[in-house]
Structures are given as structure tokens and as C-alpha cells.
A protein has these predicted regions:
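RNA pseudouridine synthases
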Residues: 1-184
Length: 184
């Protein structure tokens, strides 16, 4: 049976085990051999990264054809309006095409979220707000580009779920190991 690791990837870490040059890699947190990321989180993003020792499962998780939802909480610049939320829900025109519909809602600032190191830039004259967004595709820096396209740049991006797997109470750099009982 395949094994998975659920890692809370810290900010500034790249989603690979080697070749980080000046950036920290996954090898700083995971010493278990034979595990590979199923999908990516860019260096500036935090949260749930799923790794597996099974190629078929890795493909199912990362391939958009399987429509596995990935949910993020996102801190954005300014107070988001309903028009922007609706555009995010129905599809945003990006330079590589229109995004697929997403599930989006405004949320309060998450109380259980850890402090980011380094902290986000703060501009006292510009308020921020939070949204939760679930996407079913995985273009490069997709959510950052989506929020910027509707006029609300992303300041902080934290993935909290991949399919049925949840970040839970893992702190940055911590991981848990699970056994997958069946592949679809």
C-alpha cells in the first residue's frame, strides 16, 4: 500500500529535495527516502504539501484531469468586494487562458494561523482581507495571478487541503505519515 507524507511546507522552502542553491529544500525537513512531491507549492507559499512513494498516486494527485481540489487561505491587499469574488468563482482571464471555476468565499482572519517568517509587508494605509479558495487545476502561481488580475494582490498564501488530506495542526516544517488504503 502506498505511503504519503503530509508536510507543512514553510515559507521560503522549494518543493524539491535538492538543487535549491540558496533556497532551503525539502531535505531539511524529510529524511525518509523514496518520497516525491505530488504537485508543488512555490517558494513564497506555505502549507500542505503531499508527498508519496507511489508513482500512480503521485500522478492522480497532481494531474488536473483527476479534478482533486486544493484549498487555500489567502491574505490579499485591500478589502475584497463581491464583484472580485464572483469573477474568481466564474473564471479569470490570465495570459495562459481563462481559469476554471473556483469555490471562493470571504473569511475572517484565521486565528490559529502561525506567524510567518519573515512577516508579510505591512502598509498601514492599505487594509487587508482574507479569502478561502478551492481550485481544480494547478497553473504556475495561479492564485497569485488570479487575485492580482481582479485587483487584489496576494500577500500570503497557505494551502490547507489537497483532496481529502488536511493540514490539520501541523506546524511549519512538521509532517505526518499515513498509509493510503486504496487507489481509485
Amino acid at each position: 500500500m502506498p505511503n504519503i507524507l503530509l508536510l507543512n511546507k514553510p515559507f521560503g522552502v522549494i518543493s524539491q529535495f535538492s538543487g535549491g542553491n540558496k533556497a532551503e529544500t525539502l531535505s531539511a525537513f524529510i529524511q525518509e527516502k523514496g518520497f516525491y512531491p505530488a504537485g508543488r507549492l512555490d517558494k513564497d507559499s506555505e502549507g500542505l504539501l503531499v508527498l508519496t512513494d507511489n508513482g500512480k498516486l503521485q500522478s492522480q494527485i497532481s494531474d488536473p484531469r483527476f479534478k482533486i481540489g486544493k484549498t487555500y487561505i489567502v491574505q490579499i491587499e485591500k478589502i475584497v468586494n463581491e464583484r472580485a469574488l464572483e469573477t474568481l468563482r466564474t473564471g479569470v482571464e490570465l495570459n495562459d487562458g481563462i481559469t476554471k471555476p473556483a469555490l471562493v468565499r470571504r473569511i475572517s482572519e484565521p486565528s490559529a494561523l502561525w506567524a510567518r517568517t519573515p512577516p508579510i509587508r505591512v502598509r498601514n494605509s492599505i487594509p487587508t482581507s482574507w479569502i478561502e479558495i478551492t481550485i481544480y487545476e494547478g497553473r504556475n502561481r495561479q492564485i497569485r495571478r488570479m487575485t492580482a488580475a481582479v485587483g487584489f494582490p496576494t500577500l500570503r498564501l497557505v494551502r490547507i487541503t489537497v483532496g481529502n488530506w488536511q493540514l490539520g495542526d501541523l506546524l511549519p516544517g512538521q509532517f505526518s505519515k499515513q498509509i493510503v488504503k486504496a487507489l481509485n
